[in-house]
Amino acid sequence: MSSLTYLKKYELPPLPYNLDALEPYISKEIIDVHYNGHHRGYVNGANSFVDRVNKILKGEISSGQYDIQGLLRGLVFNINGHKLHSLYWQNMAPAGKGGGKPGGVIGDLIEKQYGSFEKFKALFTEAANSLPGTGWTVLYYEVENGNLQIMTFENHFQNHIAELPILLILDEFEHAYYLQYKNKRADYVNNWWNLVNWDFADKKLQQYMKK
């Protein structure tokens, strides 16, 4: 009989560029606070809940000494926060290396499904600007039927939301833009298009298409 390994902990991935690499569209100050503060906080939060779950599995905490719904909710929230932020960083490229119109397979699929990149961009932007409160706007690939789907969701409490085949992801929590854009979230959304890493999105799409 194999020995139990219990839940493994999460690690903060390295930022794929320097803190100032996304300027002038996203400031160094925002990236520093966002990555070293908020993202690190999700990793630490997830690991704190992992420790508690492992203590339950080991019998160190007995039934009645914890709130299982609160425990699972906190675990999912922090894991999703960590995984979605990891995608968000990779989904952007330094100023001058990102943005523009997509090529490759993703460019062809966008043209085929939406008619033009301009129509897709307008629809994604409209979805992002219509998001109430805080959350995310994403483009994901439906493996079952090959569709590209635009979706918004508030916060990140949803179970396994981070496991969707996400190709593009836009963080719309205030910590992603407020230090620079204040209450002008639409300006942040518009400028984010200058940073989109289409090469990364295209590689992700091709990976999902093989499944």
From Swiss-Prot:
Claim: Oxidoreductase is one of the keywords in the record: yes
Binding site for Fe cation: H34, H85, D171, H175
Cofactor binding note from Swiss-Prot or TrEMBL: Binds 1 Fe cation per subunit.
Superkingdom field: Archaea
Keywords in alphabetical order: Iron, Metal-binding, Oxidoreductase
A GO MF term: superoxide dismutase activity
Cofactor names: Fe cation
Alphabetized InterPro entries for the sequence: Fe/Mn_Superoxide_Dismutase, Mn/Fe_SOD, Mn/Fe_SOD_BS, Mn/Fe_SOD_C, Mn/Fe_SOD_N, Mn/Fe_SOD_N_sf, SOD_C_sf
Catalytic activity reported: 2 superoxide + 2 H(+) = H2O2 + O2
EC code: 1.15.1.1
EC category: oxidoreductase
Purpose of the protein: Destroys superoxide anion radicals which are normally produced within the cells and which are toxic to biological systems.
Family membership noted in the UniProt record: Belongs to the iron/manganese superoxide dismutase family.
Entry protein name: Superoxide dismutase [Fe]
Organism: Acidianus ambivalens
Gene field: sod
